C-alpha cells in the first residue's frame, strides 16, 4: 500500500508526514457529515453552531459568520456576535432558470439580513446573513426549485465551473453537460444533507459508502472546471482539476487535463504559494469521469492530512512529483494520457452587452460590480433582474467574473429586456473597461477570514486607477486586470491578475505584479504591507513608465516583466519567494 493513516499518523510513499490534524478526527467522528447539526439547530440559546458542527456545516454548503462591523458594539452590550450563515449554492456551470431566480430573490429579500444576492467567482450565488431559525427553510426553498448546496464548501469537490460561452451554443451545451456529470459523479453519497435539511428518512451510516471521497473525505478543498478555449473565464490555474475542451468542427472530442492549480497561501509561510496547473495530456470523452475520479482518489490518498496548509493538490504534486502523480492517475483510470492537443487562451473577461449566438438567439451580459445584486439608491439592480426574470423565456448564466448573462433571448424580445435593464441601472454605457476588468472577493463585514477590505474598497480604488490611466494618456482599451482579495486564501483570484492586492491588515495590502491577461502567469510580490495611498503612488509611477516605454500593444503585466520591474514566476515553489 502506498499510503496509511493508522495509529493517528500519515505515511505516503514511505514518507511520514506527521500526526493527523484535528479536522481528520472531526470528519472520522462525524457519522458521514451528520455530527450533531440537527441537535444544534434546536438550540435557540445561541445563534451559532458548536465547534465541530461549525466545521461540518461547510460540507452542507454553509459558513458560520457574523457582522464584523457591529461585533465590538455587541461585545460591549454583553451579547454574542450576530451569528448567521452564508450559503453557497451548487450550480454546475452557473445556469439558473427565471423561475428559480424569482424564488431565490424572494428568499433573499424576506429571510436574509442584507437582502442581497451575491454572485461569486465560483460561478454561483450566495445568500449572506441567514439566521439559524431560517436555515432549514432556506434549504427547503432551494430543494423545491431543484437547487442544493451539497459540497460547495468543505474538504470535497466544490461547485464545478464551466466557461460561460453561449455564442458557441452547441459546444457550450456539451461542455455544460459534462460539468454537471462531473459534479454528480464526485458528490458525497451520504444522505446527511437530505436527512438534516429536507427531513429525509434516516439511514444507518453502516449502509452508506463513499467510494470516491472516502469516509474522511478529501484532505482539503478541491476545485474543478470545464473550460472552452480561447476563453479562460474560469481561471484554470486557480483550480485542482481542469478539463480543457478540445473541439473538432465544433464538436467536442475530448479534453486536455490540467492538474494542480491553486492560489491560496499563508502570509509568512514560504511552504505555501500560488501555483499553475500542470498539463497531463489529452483524454477521449468516454474517459472523463474515470480520470476525474482517479485524480480525486489519488489526492484523497496522497494529500497531506497532517498539515492543512500543505494539503491541496498543488502541494501533493510538488511533494511526490508530477510524473509520479500522473502515473498513479493513469493506473487508477486505466488510461494513458495522449499528447496534449493544441489550444490557446487569449481572453478571460465577459463580453458585456449583447452578443448573437450561432443559433440566432441573443445573449445579454450584464456587468454587476463585485457581483452584489442589491437595490442601491437610483440603481435598483436586484429588482431589475427580478423584472427581467418575470418575462424572460431563456435562462440566466452566472459567470466566474461575478457577472450575469441573460441567455437565449429571441430577437423580438431584445428591446423589452434592454429597456428593463437600462431603467434599473443594469446597463450603463459609462462603465469603463478598467472597471469591467476589476474584481474583489466579499471580505468585510461578513467574511471571518478577511484581513482587509475588498468588495467595499474596490469601487473607489478603481476610480482612482482610472484617473491614473487618464492622466498618462492611455486609451480606454489599455486597461489593467486588477483584483483585490481580502486575505491570502485568494477568493478574488488576485494571484492571476496583472495587479493583485492581497489583504494584510486593515487598510494594508501586499502589492503583486506580473500576471498576464490570459491568466496563465502567477504575479510576484512587489511591495509588502503598504497602504492604499502608497499603492496608488506605486501604480502612478508604473503606469507612467508603461505609457512611455512599452512596445506596440504591450499589456501592463507583460511590460513589468520585460522592463525588469518584477521577475517572472516560472516554477512557483522555486521562484515565488526568490
Curated annotation (Swiss-Prot):
Enzyme Commission (EC) number: 1.8.1.2
Amino acids binding [4Fe-4S] cluster: 441, 447, 487, 491
Name of one Pfam family that matches: NIR_SIR_ferr
Key words of the record: 4Fe-4S, Amino-acid biosynthesis, Cysteine biosynthesis, Heme, Iron, Iron-sulfur, Metal-binding, NADP, Oxidoreductase
Gene3D superfamilies named among the record's database cross-references: Sulfite Reductase Hemoprotein, domain 1
GO terms under biological process: cysteine biosynthetic process; hydrogen sulfide biosynthetic process; sulfate assimilation
PANTHER family cross-referenced by the UniProt entry: SULFITE REDUCTASE [NADPH] SUBUNIT BETA, SULFITE REDUCTASE [NADPH] SUBUNIT BETA-RELATED
Name assigned to this protein: Sulfite reductase [NADPH] hemoprotein beta-component
Origin species: Vibrio parahaemolyticus serotype O3:K6 (strain RIMD 2210633)
Amino acid at each position: 500500500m502506498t499510503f496509511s493513516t493508522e495509529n493517528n499518523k500519515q505515511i505516503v510513499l514511505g514518507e511520514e508526514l506527521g500526526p493527523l490534524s484535528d479536522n481528520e478526527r472531526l470528519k472520522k467522528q462525524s457519522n458521514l457529515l451528520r455530527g450533531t447539526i440537527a441537535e444544534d439547530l434546536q438550540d435557540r440559546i445561541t445563534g451559532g453552531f458548536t465547534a465541530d458542527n461549525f466545521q461540518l456545516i461547510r460540507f452542507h454548503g454553509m459558513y458560520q459568520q457574523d457582522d464584523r462591523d457591529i461585533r465590538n458594539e455587541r461585545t460591549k452590550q454583553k451579547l454574542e456576535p450576530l451569528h448567521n450563515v452564508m450559503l453557497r449554492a451548487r450550480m454546475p456551470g452557473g445556469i439558473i432558470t427565471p423561475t428559480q431566480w424569482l424564488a431565490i430573490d424572494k428568499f433573499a429579500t424576506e429571510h436574509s439580513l442584507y437582502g442581497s444576492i451575491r454572485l461569486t467567482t465560483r460561478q454561483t450565488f450566495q445568500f449572506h446573513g441567514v439566521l439559524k431559525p431560517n436555515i432549514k427553510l432556506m434549504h427547503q426553498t432551494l430543494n423545491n426549485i431543484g437547487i442544493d448546496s451539497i459540497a460547495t464548501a468543505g474538504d470535497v469537490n466544490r461547485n464545478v465551473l464551466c466557461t460561460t460561452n453561449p455564442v458557441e451554443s452547441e459546444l457550450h451545451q456539451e461542455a455544460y453537460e459534462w460539468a454537471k456529470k462531473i459534479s454528480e459523479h464526485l458528490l458525497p453519497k451520504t444522505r446527511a444533507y437530505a436527512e438534516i435539511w429536507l427531513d429525509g428518512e434516516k439511514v444507518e451510516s453502516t449502509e452508506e459508502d463513499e467510494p470516491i471521497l472516502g469516509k474522511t473525505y478529501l484532505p482539503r478543498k478541491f476545485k474543478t472546471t470545464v473550460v472552452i478555449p480561447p476563453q479562460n473565464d474560469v481561471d484554470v490555474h486557480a483550480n485542482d482539476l481542469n478539463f480543457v475542451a478540445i473541439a473538432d468542427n465544433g464538436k467536442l472530442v475530448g479534453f486536455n487535463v490540467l492538474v494542480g492549480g491553486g492560489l491560496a497561501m499563508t502570509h509568512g509561510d514560504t511552504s505555501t504559494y500560488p501555483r499553475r496547473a500542470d498539463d497531463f495530456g489529452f483524454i477521449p470523452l468516454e474517459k472523463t469521469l474515470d480520470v476525474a475520479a482517479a485524480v480525486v482518489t489519488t489526492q484523497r490518498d496522497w494529500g497531506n492530512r497532517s498539515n492543512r496548509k500543505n494539503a491541496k493538490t498543488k502541494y501533493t504534486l510538488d511533494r511526490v512529483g508530477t510524473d509520479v502523480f500522473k502515473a498513479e492517475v493513469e493506473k487508477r483510470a486505466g488510461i494513458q494520457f495522449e499528447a496534449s492537443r493544441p489550444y490557446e487562451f487569449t481572453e478571460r473577461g465577459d463580453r458585456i452587452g449583447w452578443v448573437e449566438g450561432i443559433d440566432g438567439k441573443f445573449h445579454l451580459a450584464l456587468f454587476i460590480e463585485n457581483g452584489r445584486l442589491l437595490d442601491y439608491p437610483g440603481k435598483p439592480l436586484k429588482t431589475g433582474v427580478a423584472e427581467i426574470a418575470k418575462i424572460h423565456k431563456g435562462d440566466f448564466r452566472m459567470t466566474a467574473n461575478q457577472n450575469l448573462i441573460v441567455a437565449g433571448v429571441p430577437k423580438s424580445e431584445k428591446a423589452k429586456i434592454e429597456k428593463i435593464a437600462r431603467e434599473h441601472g443594469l446597463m450603463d454605457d459609462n462603465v469603463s473597461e478598467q472597471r469591467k476588468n476589476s474584481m474583489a472577493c466579499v471580505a468585510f463585514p461578513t467574511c471571518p477570514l478577511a484581513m482587509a477590505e475588498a468588495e467595499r474598497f474596490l469601487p473607489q480604488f478603481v476610480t482612482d486607477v482610472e484617473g491614473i490611466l487618464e492622466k498618462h494618456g492611455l486609451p480606454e482599451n489599455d486597461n489593467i486586470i486588477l483584483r483585490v482579495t481580502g486575505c491570502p486564501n485568494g477568493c478574488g483570484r488576485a494571484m492571476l491578475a496583472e495587479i493583485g492586492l492581497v489583504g494584510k491588515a486593515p487598510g494594508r495590502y501586499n502589492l503583486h505584479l506580473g500576471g498576464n491577461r490570459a491568466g496563465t502567469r502567477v504575479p510576484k510580490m512587489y511591495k509588502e504591507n503598504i497602504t492604499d495611498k502608497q499603492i496608488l503612488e506605486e501604480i502612478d509611477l508604473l503606469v507612467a513608465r508603461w505609457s512611455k516605454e512599452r512596445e506596440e500593444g504591450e499589456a501592463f503585466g507583460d511590460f513589468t516583466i520585460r522592463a525588469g520591474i518584477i521577475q517572472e514566476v516560472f516554477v512557483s515553489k522555486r521562484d515565488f519567494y526568490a
